[in-house]
Amino acid sequence: MMVNIGAFTGKTVVDPLRNVIGEQAYIYINYFSAAMTVLALLAVILLYKSAHTAGEGKSMREIGQGFLRIITNWRLLILILIVTGFWMVQQQLYATMPKYVIRMAGETAKPGWIANVNPFVVVCCVSFITRWMAKRTAITSMNIGMFLIPVSALLMSCGNLLGNDIISGMSNITLMMVFGIVVQALAECFISPRYLEYFSLQAPKGEEGMYLGFSHLHSFLSSIFGFGIAGVLLTKYCPDPVLFETREAWEAASVNAHYIWYYFAVIGLVAAIALFVFAKTTEFIDKKKKA
């Protein structure tokens, strides 16, 4: 919840800053992020006092051993790789969407506010969805979210396929992007809390915190691969207009810009099917062990 509150408030700076200094905003926003991170770190150092002081921290050797246990645990390793597929579709949005929307919908588009749809929906819905799915297994909840992800990518692609603007004053690119991000945020509500729950249940007693820390390996992997793929696809299907001598030449080069989202829909669908197979396989193995 706190992560998404921060995600929402942080993005409110982007569009006003871009209105003032133009594209340089995407450079200066990194300085803003660094400053906020330093302030948060100082606040933790100076103000945070743990209520639980019993026990000792782990040495780097123990942490390394814990990491080896996780990457040699086939069940957890496969789960991390599968969930990386979901987060690739999620993470790449911050690389693809701003340039896609500005290039396709025009300079007046507000990518910062469009991106804010995700944390807003998560903050509003995650508690309700988590309670609603409380009687279901973690894997069941995660499966629902995984199959929503390709739907979200397909919705995003529709903006370039529709004709006249459905809502006056809002381009179809922006409208369908918002719809897609809403579905993506709902998928996150189904997946994220239950993924952490599932991961913690695999941890030996007393090592839950360390296992939960390593559960976020998917963020590292999805950022690297998601952003890399986003750059390649933008260059191929929605290139920078400044590279073309005329508007007509750029329009011809970007006529299939929506193909970008098809790639991510396929990635999301493969990950969803993989999680479904993973769930059935592990369920069968667990039942066989109990028999």
Where are the regions that the model predicts?
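Loop-to-transmembrane helix entry
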Residues: 28, 99-123, 144, 171, ...
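C-terminal ends and interior cores of transmembrane alpha-helices
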Residues: 147-169
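Intracellular loop-helix junctions on the cytosolic face of multi-pass helical membrane proteins
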Residues: 1-2, 8, 14-94, 98-108, ...
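Hydrophobic core of transmembrane alpha-helices in multi-pass small-molecule transporters
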Residues: 166-191
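Loop-to-transmembrane helix entry/capping segments in MFS-fold secondary transporters
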Residues: 1, 108-109, 174-175, 203-218
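Helix-to-loop junctions at the C-terminal end of transmembrane segments
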Residues: 18, 124-144
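Glycine-rich segments within core transmembrane alpha-helices of 12-TM secondary carriers
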Residues: 1-18, 34-37, 115-119, 215-230
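Intracellular juxtamembrane helix-capping segments at the cytosolic ends
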Residues: 101, 189-204
